[in-house]
A protein has these predicted regions:
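Short, structured beta-strand/loop micro-motifs enriched in basic residues and often containing a Trp
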Residues: 95
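Short, small/polar residue-rich loop motifs at catalytic or cofactor-binding pockets
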Residues: 98-100
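Short, surface-exposed loop or secondary-structure junction motifs
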Residues: 1-89
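A short, polar/charged loop-to-alpha-helix boundary motif
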Residues: 124-134
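Short, well-ordered beta-strand elements
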Residues: 105, 111-120
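Short, surface-exposed charged micro-motifs
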Residues: 84, 103-105
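Residue-level recognition of short loop/turn positions
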Residues: 3, 109-110
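Solvent-exposed loop/turn segments at secondary-structure junctions
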Residues: 30, 120-123
Length: 141
């Protein structure tokens, strides 16, 4: 508000998640915490295992995180597309973004995950791509 105090807007989008789904859209409407999302990303980085528990088989994770598009077909944003996310054919990173400008990427080459979470609508991924670039520049280069 004008005094700098956080307030919940009327008709907040979170109310939509309490209603029964009328359209099933894969990950559409998926709600989680940053902590759980980071654990999910870490599980993918670990090849399907988290804290000693096997969640997915390693070949499944490798298939998920590799380009599945036929030769000659390119996903405009990153060049490739895995099973449930984009695959960057330039740097081998796998990830996805969400409606409220959320972003995650798994970088197996550099053994790291990067998450950038805002709750900004309409969707704008530009900040997250720049953030990812700066994180890699600071840590890897």
């Amino acid at each position: 508000d004008k005094s700098g105090k956080l307030i919940r807007p009327e008709n907040a989008m979170q109310d939509n998640f309490k209603k029964p789904a009328t359209l099933f859209s894969g990950g559409g409407g998926l709600v989680t915490t940053v902590e759980d999302y980071s654990r999910f990303a870490q599980m993918l980085l670990n090849g399907g295992e988290l804290e000693g528990v096997r969640i997915l088989q390693e070949p499944t994770v490798k298939m998920m995180m590799s380009d599945q598009l036929p030769e000659g077909v390119v996903y405009e944003e990153t060049g490739g597309y895995g099973l449930g996310g984009s695959y960057n054919t330039q740097n081998g990173q796998y990830g996805w973004s969400g409606a409220a400008s959320t972003f995650f990427t798994v970088d197996t080459e550099n053994d790291m995950v990067v998450l950038a979470f805002t709750q900004f609508m309409p969707f704008d991924i530009g900040y997250a791509l720049e953030f990812n670039k700066n994180v890699h520049r600071a840590i890897v280069e």
